[in-house]
Design a protein with these regions (language model features):
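A short SAM/SAH-binding and catalytic strip from SAM-dependent methyltransferases
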Residues: 100-115
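Class I SAM-dependent methyltransferase SAM/SAH-binding core
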Residues: 42-92, 101, 116
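Conserved class I S-adenosyl-L-methionine
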Residues: 130-152
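Conserved alpha-helix/loop element of class I SAM-dependent methyltransferases that forms part
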Residues: 20-40, 56
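N-terminal, positively charged/glycine-rich alpha-helical extensions of SAM-dependent methyltransferases
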Residues: 1-14, 23
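A short glycine-rich, Lys/Arg-flanked "PGG" loop and its adjoining helix->strand segment in the class I
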Residues: 115-130
């Protein structure tokens, strides 16, 4: 994980310029925000990075408090939102049952221990809380994988 963190810290200044896919998926994930019947007081954007999804969450839920969480300090510095916490997703700095809504865009594939990650998310979520995320699966970008296999 430390190598991933180092890479994100180094890339943060120019990340938005080359993150077309991340932004596109955040747009699609944000479309779900408009049909969710939840009135959250506190939202975590887990793996918020520079804030692609953060901005959309604030627009969808303007009365909520948004907390941007990322383990790459430099990415958080590029994020314009006020409440930012540099933290490990496996050890979120919140009490049990304290968060109404967690959103996360393309962060989970960087976490080798998904069980620990999900356990931690559900620990901080209120019983009626919601976790909305996007991630890559085994068939994601299969055309690109196939192309690389021909080159290799």
């Amino acid at each position: 994980m430390s190598r991933v963190r180092t890479t994100f810290n180094k890339a943060s200044a120019k990340y938005d310029d080359s993150a077309f896919l991340q932004n596109e998926i955040s747009v699609r994930l944000a479309e779900k925000l408009n049909v969710i019947s939840i009135d959250p007081k506190t939202i975590i954007d887990l793996g918020s990075g520079t804030g692609f999804l953060s901005e959309k969450a604030v627009k969808a839920f303007p009365k909520a408090t948004l907390i941007c969480i990322d383990f790459a300090q430099q990415s958080l510095l590029s994020n314009v939102h006020d409440l930012k916490v540099c933290a490990n997703a496996y050890q979120l700095p919140f009490t049990d049952n304290s968060i109404d809504f967690i959103v996360s865009n393309l962060m989970m594939q960087w976490c080798p221990d998904l069980k620990t990650l999900l356990d931690e998310c559900f620990r901080v979520l209120k019983p009626e809380g919601l976790f909305l995320f996007s991630t890559f699966g085994p068939d994601t970008l299969k055309e690109l994988k196939r192309s690389w296999s021909v080159v290799d």
